[in-house]
């Protein structure tokens, strides 16, 4: 206050809000605007927490900053000025002496922003009037905004601790309503939550997944290769007769070259060894006992020979391997006949393979032989009966019916009952088309084969 008696305004609102000054002495301010008069305070809206105790809302300035002041009804009743009955309307520009006031924080609610305001409990309206100057609000100051964020965070933390029913959705609603002070609310929300980063779940093992799928019954996984007979095993089983399936020697491991082989049964008439000019090897059957020879030839050998081979006068050689070790050819070689089972051992000859010197090449002229070609994959009931001579029938004994194996090679039991196949597998099987060569062979086989009659050598 100057010595001439004029009341001079000095800044005090910002310092009071920041806490650097205490409201111990009266503060002088200028009434810039009447936001809500005392007459409309009862029915009109108000930004104060309790509208029943608010008498008027004024905008007061200290010459540097402005602040919103809520004058209580008690303050209106105790104060006195000449135009009190008309309210604060028409008193803009006059000076106010705030004798008792306090700083409060308005939380954002109902579209109103969060801000600091002063609650005036006792004041005096001076007759001095000065020209009004527009000044910025104190809540726009950076230091005041920082202090406001701290106060909001403290207020929300206290309300959260005191009221356990405050949910996260309510906090988000408050953040949505108060876009201006969203940063402080975000910091408060992060402090209320436990942010530990992404949670990496432990990897689920195969056995854990199988255990979760099991519903009271044991679940086992068996490879399909153990439940199905491979093509090589099926080829070997189909190439053997009923007797050899139960009493024959143990077969070697399957060879991939067997996939293109066919079974050819050749019945040749008896002939003397001297007619060919080539001595017989040891282990071969004599002319009286040789009635049937079995040879596994490549499927390509059944086709027509090359033109260069057609000019040759020699017929197709009959390949038969002896179980014993063969010795070099000599005129003193033993000619002891062996049993039919020892001499007629199936031999595997891959395609385009030249017979070795240890194999017997029968070059003697023979009569046309009757051949039955059997392809792998046909059921046993569609196969033509094998030709048998009298000597072979007398030598062989009746064999028992072949029974399917009970266990796999690894000792696991066979499973002959399966669930119905899936729809996709049925569709794939129905979409398979047979090759024309197989269809032609099947038609020829059905039209020419006579199961009731037994072929005779020509």
Swiss-Prot record:
Keywords: Chromosome, Disease variant, DNA-binding, Dyskeratosis congenita, Isopeptide bond, Nucleus, Phosphoprotein, Telomere, Ubl conjugation. One of its GO terms (cellular component) is chromosome, telomeric region. Changing residue 405 to T: In DKCB7; localizes properly on telomeres; decreased interaction with TINF2. The modification Phosphoserine is found at residues 25, 349. InterPro entries: ACD, TPP1/Est3. A motif (PWI) lies at residues 11-13. There is a cross-link at residue 381 (Glycyl lysine isopeptide (Lys-Gly) (interchain with G-Cter in SUMO2)). One of its GO terms (biological process) is intracellular protein transport. Residues 265-368, 387-406 are annotated as: Disordered. Residues 158-251 are annotated as: Interaction with POT1. Component of the shelterin complex (telosome) that is involved in the regulation of telomere length and protection. Shelterin associates with arrays of double-stranded TTAGGG repeats added by telomerase and protects chromosome ends. Without its protective activity, telomeres are no longer hidden from the DNA damage surveillance and chromosome ends are inappropriately processed by DNA repair pathways. Promotes binding of POT1 to single-stranded telomeric DNA. Modulates the inhibitory effects of POT1 on telomere elongation. This is Adrenocortical dysplasia protein homolog. It comes from Homo sapiens (Human). The lineage of its organism: Eukaryota, Metazoa, Chordata, Craniata, Vertebrata.
């Amino acid at each position: 206050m100057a010595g001439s008696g004029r009341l001079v305004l000095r800044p005090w609102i910002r310092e009071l809000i920041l806490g650097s000054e205490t409201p111990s002495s009266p503060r002088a301010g200028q009434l810039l605007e009447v936001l809500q008069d005392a007459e409309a305070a009862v029915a009109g809206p108000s930004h104060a927490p309790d509208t029943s105790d608010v008498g008027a809302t004024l905008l007061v300035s200290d010459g540097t900053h402005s602040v919103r002041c809520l004058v209580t009804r008690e303050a209106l009743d105790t104060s006195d000025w000449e135009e009190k009955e008309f309210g604060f309307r028409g008193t803009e520009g006059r000076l106010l002496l705030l004798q008792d006031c306090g700083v409060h924080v308005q939380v954002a609610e109902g579209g109103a922003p969060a801000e600091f305001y002063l609650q005036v409990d006792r004041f005096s309206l001076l007759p001095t009037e000065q020209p009004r100057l527009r000044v910025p609000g104190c809540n726009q100051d950076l230091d005041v905004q920082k202090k406001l964020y701290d106060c909001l965070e403290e207020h929300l933390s206290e309300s959260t601790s005191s009221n356990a029913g405050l949910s996260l959705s309510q906090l988000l609603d408050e953040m949505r309503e108060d876009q201006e002070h969203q940063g402080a609310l975000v910091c408060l929300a992060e402090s209320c939550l436990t942010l530990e980063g992404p949670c990496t779940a432990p990897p689920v093992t195969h056995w854990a997944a199988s255990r979760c799928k099991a519903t009271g019954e044991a679940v086992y996984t068996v490879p399909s290769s153990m439940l199905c007979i491979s093509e090589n095993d099926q080829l070997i089983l189909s190439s053997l007769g009923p007797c050899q399936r139960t009493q024959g020697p143990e077969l070697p491991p399957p060879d991939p070259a067997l996939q293109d082989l066919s079974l050819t049964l050749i019945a040749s008439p008896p002939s003397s060894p001297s007619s060919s000019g080539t001595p017989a090897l040891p282990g071969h059957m004599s002319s009286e006992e040789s009635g049937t020879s079995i040879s596994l030839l490549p499927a390509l050998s059944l086709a027509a020979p090359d033109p260069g081979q057609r000019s040759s006068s020699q017929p197709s050689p009959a390949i038969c391997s002896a179980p014993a070790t063969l010795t070099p050819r000599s005129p003193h070689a033993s000619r002891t006949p062996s049993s039919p089972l020892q001499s007629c051992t199936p031999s595997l000859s891959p395609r385009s393979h030249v017979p070795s010197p240890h194999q017997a090449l029968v070059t003697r002229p023979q009569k046309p032989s009757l051949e039955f070609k059997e392809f792998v994959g046909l059921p046993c009931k569609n196969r033509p009966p094998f030709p048998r001579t009298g000597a072979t029938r007398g030598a062989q004994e009746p064999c028992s019916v072949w029974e399917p194996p009970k266990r796999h090679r690894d000792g696991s039991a066979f499973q002959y009952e399966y669930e119905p196949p899936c729809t996709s597998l049925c569709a794939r099987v129905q979409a398979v088309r047979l090759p024309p060569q197989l269809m032609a062979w099947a038609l020829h086989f059905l039209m020419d084969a006579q199961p009731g009659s037994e072929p005779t050598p020509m």
